[in-house]
Amino acid sequence: MKIAAATALFASLAAAGPVELTERQSCPKVYIFAARETTVPQSNGYGTTANLVNSVKSAFSGAGSEAIVYPACGGGSACGGISYDNSASQGTAAVVKAVTAYNQKCPSTQIVLIGYSQGGQIMDNALCGGAGSTLTGNALAAVQAAIFMGDPHNRNGLPYNVGTCKAQGFAARPNGFTCSPAKTSIIQSYCDSQDPYCCNGNDANHHQQYVNIYGNQALSFIKSKVTA
């Protein structure tokens, strides 16, 4: 029996192509891309999203993750004086490049996007447009869930909004905006009225609290969208 089982195993491996074998061996069922907020150094990786990233990885055994490499700058000298708009444009391009490349390597892996503040904005751009190219085709289809927290693109009335904000962020989407090409059903965007960046509040500390306040809700949403 053992010999027969081993023979069947070797036969199945021989029948599989090299790409299929590589995917079986190295591609997880779930992979997370996360983007940090403005002024947080690249060495800090995920920034404020870290606890949520770790929660998602705990929920899906074997899940992988990586931080988007981009300036996360707002004009300050510590990040090279790169303007906020330039940083967001670079970040958006980095998201599209990283997700597309990963999908080409691991086409069956389900992808989750998580972004905080400017990091949320670049994920927003990659899915919904606004700063260069967006995700398209198979790479877009691989994204099963996206979480934006404190996204300055926030505008009241968008179908994926969560939280108490009834106004808009400092880089708000225009009136009548429609997210495209992504399906809005895969997105949740968290913003509260106290936040001066994604809304019109005056409590900058609240801007850092979304994982604490909504982390469990965001995790539940992700779990409802990912089938692994």
Regions found by a protein language model. Give the residues of each.
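Active-site catalytic motif of lipid deacylating hydrolases and related acyltransferases
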Residues: 24-109, 188-215, 224
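Conserved hydrolase catalytic core segment
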Residues: 129-139
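Fungal secretory targeting signals
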Residues: 1-24, 228
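Extracellular/periplasmic catalytic domains that process cell-envelope and extracellular macromolecules
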Residues: 25-27, 105-106, 137-142, 179-184
